[in-house]
């Protein structure tokens, strides 16, 4: 009895010493790092966070500590930036210092600092420069890609017509359509909508993307060093990511066998040619691992974000039939019913442009942004962030900044309209991030959102099995990503 009592006292004393050391260490750094709740050893601020509502938890902490604060996600120390001012100061005004890539533990299981999206430094710069130039070579930002989107929109509309107004889940209708646009660039061809391998890839992408938004996904962000060895949903996410990598590797091998260095067919060919050109460069970033993982970055990002935004958009328009009716009216007035929408039409369609921007703002696809890392000791406001400090630029807090949007939690296209009903830009519209590492697929995504939505709405009215007032537009999951509720709907020909 005495021995067990002494053991208990010793354990409590040991834990107390650890906590005191943690507090001392935190206070020692308080003159440098932003303030924040005191972390416990290893678990950090886990007890102050709700992994089911990580974004909301962090925003609640910001109410106490201000727009720039420090949080410990398990053993991982992160500086969090909230609101348009703080995020712009970091990502634009001090763009170079904040250009490093932080952790995204689920994706890091596969990428490990390779590929254009999750790399840093010279590797990121070279791969980004090459990717932007190559996408342009294959028509992105030009008439060529617009025609490809219009063609794919035609296939999608035909698929919706075949449903004859029955209730359907639009998830894979949208993802296979959006994915085919980026597929034609990176693989040189589109997939048939019923291709089983294609549908399997889309499920893998959706599964791993949704995992990052779950409570387990957020827990994994804190304790990946332990959880990667344990059974659980994270193992399924790894399996899905591995399946995607295997598919890309197979595609690359097919291209290698039939490569003509004088006539690149797609992004993979262009990268393979660059690899041949830089074969004797010992510092080259153009090798197989970066090819496979950069291609996967483009394929994944070019599929999930736009298709999920459209899926959220359909739900919001069914919730607000008055807004849907105004978009229909503008489409009929500007485009009519006898030709496809063109990207230049948006200049004469301020209301539709405002609706699309408001869908993106409300959907808030990546609310905590892709984590950054400071590339050197960085003075930020009155703080000093040591080199390597991770940073969360909370894009959701910018998209919902009350200084820029009068009712940030409401869906209202007037957020992007002036008093005369003309479209107005906002400095707080940052769904593609800002600064040196903004999403370089932004131009393609904007074109896809406009052309897909207008061409679909030119042909169909949206019908929910629920009355508008009963439709819940609250996200199903919010973590790294925002996932809209599952729903069914009918596409009724106009």
Swiss-Prot record:
**E.C. designation(s):** 1.14.14.1
Residues reported to bind heme:
439
Question: Which Pfam families does the entry link to?
Answer: p450
Instruction: Please tell me whether the keyword Transcription is annotated for this protein.
Output: no
Top-rank EC class of the record's enzyme: oxidoreductase
* GO biological process terms, semicolon-separated: coumarin metabolic process; epoxygenase P450 pathway; response to stilbenoid; xenobiotic metabolic process
Q: What is the induction note for this entry?
A: By 3-methylcholanthrene (3MC).
Q: What is its main location?
A: endoplasmic reticulum
Localization, per the record, is: Endoplasmic reticulum membrane; Microsome membrane
* Annotated protein name in UniProt: Cytochrome P450 2A3
């Amino acid at each position: 009895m005495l021995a067990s009592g002494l053991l208990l006292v010793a354990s409590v004393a040991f834990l107390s010493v650890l906590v005191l050391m943690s507090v001392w260490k935190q206070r020692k750094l308080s003159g440098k790092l932003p303030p924040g709740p005191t972390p416990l050893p290893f678990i950090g601020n886990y007890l102050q966070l709700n992994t089911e509502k990580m974004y909301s938890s962090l925003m609640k902490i910001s109410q106490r500590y201000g727009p720039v604060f420090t949080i410990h996600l398990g053993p991982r120390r992160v500086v969090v930036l909230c609101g348009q001012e703080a995020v712009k100061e970091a990502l634009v005004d001090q763009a170079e210092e904040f250009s490093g890539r932080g952790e995204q533990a689920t994706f890091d299981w596969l990428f490990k600092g390779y590929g254009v999206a999750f790399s840093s430094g010279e590797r990121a710069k070279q791969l980004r420069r090459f990717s932007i130039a190559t996408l342009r070579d294959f028509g992105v930002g030009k008439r060529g890609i617009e025609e490809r989107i219009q063609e794919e929109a035609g296939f999608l509309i035909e698929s919706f017509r075949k449903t004859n107004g029955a209730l359907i889940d639009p998830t894979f209708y949208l993802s296979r359509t959006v994915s085919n646009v980026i597929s034609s660039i990176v693989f040189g061809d589109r997939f048939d909508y019923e291709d089983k391998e294609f549908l399997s890839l889309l499920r893998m992408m959706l599964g791993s993307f949704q995992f990052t938004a779950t409570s387990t996904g957020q827990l994994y962000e804190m304790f990946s060093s332990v959880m990667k060895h344990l059974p659980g949903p994270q193992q399924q996410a790894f399996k899905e990511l591995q399946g995607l990598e295997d598919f890309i590797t197979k595609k690359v091998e097919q291209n290698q066998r039939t490569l003509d260095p004088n006539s690149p067919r797609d992004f993979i060919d262009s990268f393979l040619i660059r690899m041949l050109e830089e074969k004797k460069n010992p510092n080259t970033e153009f090798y197989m691992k970066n090819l496979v993982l950069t291609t996967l970055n483009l394929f994944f990002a070019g599929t999930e974000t736009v298709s999920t935004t459209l899926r959220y958009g359909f739900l919001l328009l069914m919730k607000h039939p008055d807004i849907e009716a105004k978009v229909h009216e503008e489409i009929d007035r500007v485009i009519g019913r006898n030709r496809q929408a063109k990207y230049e039409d948006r200049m004469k369609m301020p209301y539709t442009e405002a609706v699309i921007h408001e869908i993106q703002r409300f959907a808030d696809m990546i609310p905590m942004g892709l984590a950054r890392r400071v590339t050197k000791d960085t003075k930020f406001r009155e703080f000093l962030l040591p080199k390597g400090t991770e940073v969360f630029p909370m894009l959701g807090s910018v998209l919902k900044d009350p200084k820029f949007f009068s009712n940030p939690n409401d869906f209202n296209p007037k957020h992007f309209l002036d008093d005369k009903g003309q479209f107005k830009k906002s400095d707080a519209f940052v769904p593609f991030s800002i600064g040196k590492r903004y999403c370089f697929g932004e131009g393609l995504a904007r074109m896809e959102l406009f052309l897909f939505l207008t061409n679909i709405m030119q042909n169909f009215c949206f019908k929910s099995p629920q009355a508008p007032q009963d439709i819940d537009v609250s996200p199903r999951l919010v973590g790294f990503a925002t996932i809209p509720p599952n729903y069914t709907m009918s596409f009724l020909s106009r």
